């Protein structure tokens, strides 16, 4: 079907291809340009080609996106370097000065022993141990609540990095546990995201029904409902948890919001971790934090899914509109070309007709002038113009009379002819 359609209507979807109006045959048969506009343009590309174009990204597009990402990384690296490197240099200088001051004030401690102590402290911090105070007020990072929270960070792929397995058995079990737990959590996240999407969808439907009663356009309703959905989710999963973390952990408002966003986007730097401070927590605090992470990730997944659906719809509509625009553009181009050719043909015909009429008039006038000239200027009826100087006039013979015509400066044999003489004196 598509092949036959493309053979019948190549180029564009007009009913009849625009004829070449400068061609004598077509010009004779088509006195006017044949314009045709189809109400529903047909996209000539096959469905298989369009599907493959949608499903498979071209290398040119991939290369362009790759260059954009690299440029984005370079910009980010430049900004982070400008913001963070001066602070790093300042802290390094401060530590060196403090070490020198400590060694100067404590002669019994040499620099080698102090460096060994610092290395042990750094290793303890990397292991998740805060070497402050004595052993009586130290909180274990591997109690049941902390272990539950760590297992949750494994299967959610957040991986804060503040604690990690140190034994060989723990590392082996973590590998197997992650390979099995991550897909399982993916199914759970999808299910929770669908349920949240359904709940929010019902709420959005009620909001849309309310706006429909107020005669608000569908586009504005969709925009308003989307903004409400995003704002409600941000308040429930970002603002409210940030306030709770600020109060419990003793963080600033910026640090609390920073932790929430870094966690729910699964970045998980580990510089701020809920339940990681050296304070007394409730036993159910860390499990509750993990359930908040679960629901928050599901919300973000629902938002991303909704955005993806919108982008697909917009992309589909855009492709259809582009196809229709191309079809109309091709048809318009053909029609304009046909009209231009017809205009040029008409101008050529008019110019040719005027030229022919001018030529005919010229020939007619030339024929008439030639006839009058032959009739008037016969050998017996000539008009002679004789120019004389004053001195020459005196030398010339007197006028000869031939009937009523006088000759001046002519030979005598012309006296018998009817010749008109005009004397121009200089």
Swiss-Prot record:
K(+) 3 binds at residues 159-160, 268-269. Residues 1-10 have a biased composition (Basic and acidic residues). K(+) 1 binds at residues 157-158, 266-267. Phosphorylation at Ser-348 controls the reversible conversion from a leak channel to a voltage-dependent channel. Residues 266-271 are annotated as: Selectivity filter 2. One of its GO terms (cellular component) is postsynaptic density membrane. Detected in hippocampus astrocytes (at protein level). Detected in dorsal root ganglia (DRG) neurons (at protein level). High expression in brain and lung. Also detected in kidney, heart and skeletal muscle. Not detected in liver. In the brain, highest expression in olfactory bulb, hippocampus and cerebellum. Activated by various stimuli including intracellular acidic pH, mechanical stretch and polyunsaturated fatty acids such as arachidonic acid. Activated by volatile general anesthetics such as chloroform, diethyl ether, halothane and isoflurane. Activated by arylsulfonamide ML335 and thiophene-carboxamide ML402 compounds. Inhibited by extracellular acidification. Inhibited by antidepressant metabolite fluoxetine (Prozac). Inhibited by barium. Not sensitive to polycationic dye ruthenium red. Signal peptide: none annotated. Each subunit contributes two pore-forming domains 1 and 2 which assemble to form a single pore with M2 and M4 transmembrane helices lining the central cavity and M1 and M3 facing the lipid bilayer. The transmembrane helices are bridged by the selectivity filters 1 and 2 carrying a signature sequence TxTTxGYGD that coordinate the permeant ions. Up to four ions can simultaneously occupy the selectivity filter and at least two elementary charges must translocate across the filter to convert it into the open conformation. Residues 17-38, 51-61 are annotated as: Important for GNG4 binding and L-glutamate release in astrocytes. The record marks 141 as: pH sensor. The chain crosses the membrane at residues 62-82, 172-192, 223-243, 288-308. GO terms for molecular function: identical protein binding; ligand-gated channel activity; mechanosensitive potassium channel activity; metal ion binding; outward rectifier potassium channel activity; potassium ion leak channel activity; protein heterodimerization activity; voltage-gated potassium channel activity. Residues 1-36 are annotated as: Disordered. Residues 337-385 are annotated as: Essential for chloroform and halothane sensitivity. Residues 157-162 are annotated as: Selectivity filter 1. InterPro entries: 2pore_dom_K_chnl, 2pore_dom_K_chnl_TREK, K_chnl_dom. It is found in: Cell projection, Axon; Cell membrane, Sarcolemma. This is Potassium channel subfamily K member 2. GO terms for biological process: cardiac ventricle development; cellular response to arachidonate; cellular response to hypoxia; chemical synaptic transmission, postsynaptic; chloride transmembrane transport; cochlea development; detection of mechanical stimulus involved in sensory perception of touch; G protein-coupled receptor signaling pathway. The keyword Nucleus does not apply. The keyword Disulfide bond applies. It catalyses: K(+)(in) = K(+)(out); L-glutamate(out) = L-glutamate(in); chloride(in) = chloride(out); Rb(+)(in) = Rb(+)(out). It comes from Mus musculus (Mouse).
């Amino acid at each position: 079907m598509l092949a036959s359609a493309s053979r019948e209507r190549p180029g564009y979807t007009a009913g009849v291809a625009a004829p070449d109006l400068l061609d004598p045959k077509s010009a004779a048969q088509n006195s006017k340009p044949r314009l045709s506009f189809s109400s529903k343009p047909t996209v000539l590309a096959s469905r298989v080609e369009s599907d493959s174009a949608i499903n498979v990204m071209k290398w040119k597009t991939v290369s362009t996106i790759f260059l954009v990402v690299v440029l984005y990384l370079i910009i980010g690296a430049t900004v982070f370097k400008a913001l963070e490197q001066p602070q790093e240099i300042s802290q390094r200088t401060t530590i060196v000065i403090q070490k020198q001051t400590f060694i100067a004030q404590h002669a019994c401690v040499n620099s080698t022993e102090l460096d060994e102590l610092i290395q042990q402290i750094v290793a303890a911090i990397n292991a998740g141990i805060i070497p402050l105070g004595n052993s009586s007020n130290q909180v274990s990072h591997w109690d049941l609540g902390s272990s539950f929270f760590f297992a949750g960070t494994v299967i959610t792929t957040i991986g804060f990095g503040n604690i990690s397995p140190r034994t060989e058995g723990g590392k082996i079990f973590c590998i197997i546990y992650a390979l099995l737990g991550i897909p399982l959590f993916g199914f759970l996240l999808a299910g929770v995201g669908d349920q949240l999407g359904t709940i929010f969808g019902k709420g959005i439907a009620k909001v849309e029904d309310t706006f429909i009663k107020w005669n608000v356009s569908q586009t504005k309703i969709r925009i308003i409902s989307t903004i409400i959905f995003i704002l409600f989710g941000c308040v429930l999963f970002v603002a409210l948890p940030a306030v709770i973390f600020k109060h419990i952990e003793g963080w600033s408002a910026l640090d609390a919001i920073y932790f929430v966003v870094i966690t729910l986007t699964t970045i998980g730097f580990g510089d701020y971790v809920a339940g990681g401070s050296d304070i007394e927590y409730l036993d159910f605090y860390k499990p509750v934090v993990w359930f908040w992470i679960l629901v928050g990730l599901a919300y973000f997944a629902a938002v991303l899914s909704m955005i993806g659906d919108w982008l697909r719809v917009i992309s589909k509509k855009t492709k259809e509109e582009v196809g229709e625009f191309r079809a109309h553009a091709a048809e318009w181009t053909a029609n304009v070309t046909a009209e231009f050719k017809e205009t040029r043909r008409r101008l050529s015909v008019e110019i040719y007709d005027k030229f022919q009429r001018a030529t005919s008039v010229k020939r007619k006038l030339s024929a008439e002038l030639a006839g009058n000239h032959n009739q008037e200027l016969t050998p017996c009826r000539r008009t002679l113009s004789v120019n004389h100087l004053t001195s020459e006039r005196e030398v010339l013979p007197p006028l000869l009379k031939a009937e009523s015509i006088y000759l001046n400066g002519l030979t005598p044999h012309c006296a018998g002819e009817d010749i008109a003489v005009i004397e121009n004196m200089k």
